[in-house]
Protein backbone atom coordinates (compact mmCIF):
# COMPACT_ATOMS: atom_id res chain seq x y z
CA UNK A 1 0.00 0.00 0.00
CA UNK A 2 1.21 3.50 -0.76
CA UNK A 3 1.30 6.44 1.60
CA UNK A 4 -2.13 7.52 0.33
CA UNK A 5 -4.12 9.56 2.80
CA UNK A 6 -7.32 11.56 2.60
CA UNK A 7 -7.75 14.88 4.42
CA UNK A 8 -11.36 16.16 4.57
CA UNK A 9 -11.68 19.93 4.13
CA UNK A 10 -14.21 20.19 6.94
CA UNK A 11 -16.71 21.83 4.60
CA UNK A 12 -19.97 20.32 3.33
CA UNK A 13 -17.94 18.42 0.75
CA UNK A 14 -14.41 17.86 -0.56
CA UNK A 15 -11.18 16.30 0.60
CA UNK A 16 -7.52 16.57 -0.33
CA UNK A 17 -5.83 13.41 -1.54
CA UNK A 18 -2.13 13.00 -0.72
CA UNK A 19 0.47 10.36 -1.47
CA UNK A 20 -0.51 9.35 -5.01
CA UNK A 21 1.19 10.24 -8.29
CA UNK A 22 -1.49 10.31 -10.99
CA UNK A 23 1.15 10.46 -13.72
CA UNK A 24 1.72 6.76 -12.99
CA UNK A 25 -0.87 3.99 -13.36
CA UNK A 26 -2.97 3.74 -10.19
CA UNK A 27 -3.32 0.17 -8.94
CA UNK A 28 -6.71 -1.29 -8.02
CA UNK A 29 -6.16 -1.07 -4.26
CA UNK A 30 -5.23 2.61 -4.37
CA UNK A 31 -8.06 3.39 -6.80
CA UNK A 32 -10.55 1.63 -4.52
CA UNK A 33 -9.52 3.99 -1.70
CA UNK A 34 -9.81 6.99 -4.02
CA UNK A 35 -13.28 5.87 -5.18
CA UNK A 36 -14.37 5.36 -1.57
CA UNK A 37 -13.16 8.86 -0.66
CA UNK A 38 -14.97 10.29 -3.68
CA UNK A 39 -18.22 8.58 -2.64
CA UNK A 40 -17.85 10.01 0.86
CA UNK A 41 -16.60 13.55 0.08
CA UNK A 42 -18.03 14.10 -3.46
CA UNK A 43 -15.11 16.31 -4.58
CA UNK A 44 -11.45 15.34 -4.38
CA UNK A 45 -8.45 17.63 -4.85
CA UNK A 46 -5.11 16.15 -5.95
CA UNK A 47 -2.60 19.01 -5.62
CA UNK A 48 0.85 19.11 -7.17
CA UNK A 49 0.17 16.69 -10.03
CA UNK A 50 2.03 16.95 -13.35
CA UNK A 51 -0.12 15.34 -16.03
CA UNK A 52 -0.35 15.36 -19.78
CA UNK A 53 -3.60 14.69 -21.64
CA UNK A 54 -2.96 10.96 -21.91
CA UNK A 55 -2.28 10.63 -18.18
CA UNK A 56 -5.44 12.59 -17.38
CA UNK A 57 -7.45 10.38 -19.72
CA UNK A 58 -5.96 7.21 -18.22
CA UNK A 59 -6.89 8.23 -14.67
CA UNK A 60 -10.30 9.58 -15.72
CA UNK A 61 -11.15 6.30 -17.43
CA UNK A 62 -10.86 4.53 -14.07
CA UNK A 63 -14.18 6.18 -13.13
CA UNK A 64 -15.94 4.88 -16.24
CA UNK A 65 -16.21 5.31 -19.98
CA UNK A 66 -15.06 8.73 -21.16
CA UNK A 67 -17.51 11.11 -22.84
CA UNK A 68 -16.51 13.23 -25.79
CA UNK A 69 -15.97 16.89 -25.13
CA UNK A 70 -19.26 18.58 -26.13
CA UNK A 71 -17.61 21.28 -28.25
CA UNK A 72 -15.49 18.77 -30.16
CA UNK A 73 -18.34 16.32 -30.57
CA UNK A 74 -20.78 18.95 -31.81
CA UNK A 75 -19.10 21.94 -33.38
CA UNK A 76 -15.31 22.05 -33.35
CA UNK A 77 -14.12 23.13 -36.79
CA UNK A 78 -10.72 21.49 -37.00
CA UNK A 79 -9.79 23.57 -40.05
CA UNK A 80 -9.94 26.69 -37.86
CA UNK A 81 -8.11 25.23 -34.91
CA UNK A 82 -4.79 23.79 -33.81
CA UNK A 83 -6.82 21.12 -32.05
CA UNK A 84 -5.75 18.07 -34.01
CA UNK A 85 -4.73 15.70 -31.24
CA UNK A 86 -7.12 12.79 -30.60
CA UNK A 87 -7.00 13.69 -26.90
CA UNK A 88 -8.98 16.84 -27.71
CA UNK A 89 -11.97 14.60 -28.37
CA UNK A 90 -11.86 13.65 -24.68
CA UNK A 91 -10.10 16.53 -22.86
CA UNK A 92 -11.63 20.01 -22.98
CA UNK A 93 -9.07 22.80 -23.00
CA UNK A 94 -10.39 26.02 -21.51
CA UNK A 95 -7.91 28.80 -22.16
CA UNK A 96 -7.54 32.42 -23.17
CA UNK A 97 -4.14 31.62 -24.73
CA UNK A 98 -3.55 31.95 -28.47
CA UNK A 99 -0.76 30.33 -30.45
CA UNK A 100 0.04 31.78 -33.87
CA UNK A 101 -3.22 33.74 -33.72
CA UNK A 102 -5.37 30.68 -33.04
CA UNK A 103 -7.06 29.82 -29.75
CA UNK A 104 -5.63 26.69 -28.14
CA UNK A 105 -8.84 26.11 -26.21
CA UNK A 106 -12.41 27.23 -25.77
CA UNK A 107 -14.21 29.93 -23.78
CA UNK A 108 -11.28 32.36 -23.78
CA UNK A 109 -11.71 34.96 -21.04
CA UNK A 110 -15.38 34.18 -20.56
CA UNK A 111 -16.75 32.91 -17.28
CA UNK A 112 -19.23 30.10 -17.21
CA UNK A 113 -22.50 30.54 -15.40
CA UNK A 114 -23.31 28.08 -12.63
CA UNK A 115 -23.83 24.69 -14.26
CA UNK A 116 -23.50 20.94 -13.92
CA UNK A 117 -21.25 19.42 -16.58
CA UNK A 118 -23.22 17.76 -19.37
CA UNK A 119 -26.43 17.56 -17.31
CA UNK A 120 -28.41 17.94 -20.54
CA UNK A 121 -27.55 14.33 -21.45
CA UNK A 122 -30.13 11.64 -20.75
CA UNK A 123 -27.38 9.78 -18.89
CA UNK A 124 -24.96 12.44 -17.56
CA UNK A 125 -21.35 11.48 -16.85
CA UNK A 126 -20.61 9.88 -13.52
CA UNK A 127 -17.81 12.36 -12.82
CA UNK A 128 -15.97 15.37 -14.15
CA UNK A 129 -12.26 15.89 -13.65
CA UNK A 130 -10.71 19.35 -13.74
CA UNK A 131 -6.96 19.74 -14.16
CA UNK A 132 -5.68 23.31 -13.84
CA UNK A 133 -2.36 24.28 -15.39
CA UNK A 134 -2.51 28.00 -14.75
CA UNK A 135 -5.00 29.90 -12.62
CA UNK A 136 -5.11 33.69 -12.28
CA UNK A 137 -4.16 35.26 -8.93
CA UNK A 138 -7.71 36.62 -8.66
CA UNK A 139 -10.80 34.91 -10.01
CA UNK A 140 -10.62 31.60 -11.80
CA UNK A 141 -12.54 29.95 -8.96
CA UNK A 142 -14.52 26.77 -9.38
CA UNK A 143 -17.47 26.23 -7.06
CA UNK A 144 -19.10 23.01 -5.97
CA UNK A 145 -22.45 22.41 -4.30
CA UNK A 146 -23.46 19.45 -2.16
CA UNK A 147 -26.90 18.67 -3.55
CA UNK A 148 -27.42 16.00 -0.87
CA UNK A 149 -27.20 18.69 1.83
CA UNK A 150 -29.62 20.82 -0.14
CA UNK A 151 -32.06 17.95 -0.54
CA UNK A 152 -32.00 16.89 3.10
CA UNK A 153 -32.01 20.36 4.67
CA UNK A 154 -34.54 22.11 2.43
CA UNK A 155 -38.12 22.36 3.62
CA UNK A 156 -40.49 19.87 2.09
CA UNK A 157 -42.81 21.32 -0.59
CA UNK A 158 -45.63 20.59 1.86
CA UNK A 159 -44.06 22.70 4.63
Spans of features found by a protein language model:
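Flexible glycine-rich active-site/ligand-binding loops centered on an Asp-His dyad
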Residues: 146-150
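Conserved small/polar residues in nucleotide/adenosyl-binding loops
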Residues: 152-159
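Non-heme Fe(II)-dependent double-stranded beta-helix
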Residues: 2-142
Amino acid sequence: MTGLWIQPTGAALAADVHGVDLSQPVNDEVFARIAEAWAEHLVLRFSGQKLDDRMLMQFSARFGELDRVPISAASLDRADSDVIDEAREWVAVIASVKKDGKAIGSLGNYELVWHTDMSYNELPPRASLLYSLEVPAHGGNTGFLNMYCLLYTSPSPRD
